[in-house]
Structures are given as structure tokens and as C-alpha cells.
Amino acid sequence: MFFWLLLRDRLGTRELLRRRNMHLPSYDCACCTLDVEETLSHLFLTCSFAQDCWLKLNVIFVETDPFLALEEIKTQLHLPFYMDIIILFCWSIWMQRNDFIFKGIPPSPERCLQNFRKEFALVILRAKAR
């Protein structure tokens, strides 16, 4: 459901809330110190926090276009299940963002990677159980 919402630009970013005329004190990204509106592209690709997270996965990309960035990530991962990794990693970034906004827990690239590993291990276990 998460990635379906992301692909259709329906994930509850601050930009989407602004477009839906919801008033917030700020529409800037909560995960970085830049005064940049929190868009999907920013949150998952160009945000300094997101880039630090991707770096923990040994993925570096310079593209800001989402489709070209996906191609760069695919090339660097060299795995047939690269989309599973991308989806789970975006989910981990999203959860870090939500923990900060709703619980006041500062985002951490290390915790993002740790959460990704836990989620990925669960995916592997479910796949083996079938």
C-alpha cells in the first residue's frame, strides 16, 4: 500500500497536505536543515538525511529525477530483487520521518538501516515459509 501511494503521489507529504489546503506551521522537510518543501522527490532522494541513509546501504546517486535515480540504484545494487530493497528502504525513511514528526524521535541513518534490515529479514522469512 505504501509504495502504491508513493507512486501515485498520494503519500501524505507536506507538499500534498499543502495542495489539499491543509494549514501547517511549515511545509519544509522535517528531516533536514534545508528550507525546502517536503516533496516525494526531496524526501526520498535529495534530502540530506535520505542521502545519508542511502549511503549506509552503499548507494550513491546524483540524479534528482526519480526514474533516473531508480536506474542508478538498480545498477549499483546488482540484484534481481532490487525493487524490494528500494520499497523497503523508502519505507524505512518514511518511518524515520514519521517517528520524528509524531513522536519527536530525531531521524537517524543508522536506525533507518537497522529498521530496513529487520523488515528485510521478515520478508525473507515469509518467502521461505511459502
Question: What do these predicted ranges mean?
Answer:
Residues 90-104:
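K/E-rich alpha-helical interaction surfaces of small helical-bundle regulatory domains
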Residues 16-24, 37-41, 76-85, 101-111:
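Conserved, non-catalytic sequence blocks in retroelement Pol enzymes and Pol-derived host proteins
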Residues 105, 110-130:
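C-terminal domain-tail junction helix/linker
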Residues 1-37:
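Helix/loop segments that flank and initiate small ligand/metal-binding modules
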Residues 32-36, 50-53, 97:
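Cys/His-rich metal-chelating microdomains
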Residues 40-46, 58-62, 106-107:
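Short cysteine/histidine-rich zinc-coordinating motifs and their immediately flanking basic loops
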Residues 27-36, 67-79:
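Short, conserved non-catalytic motifs in the polymerase core
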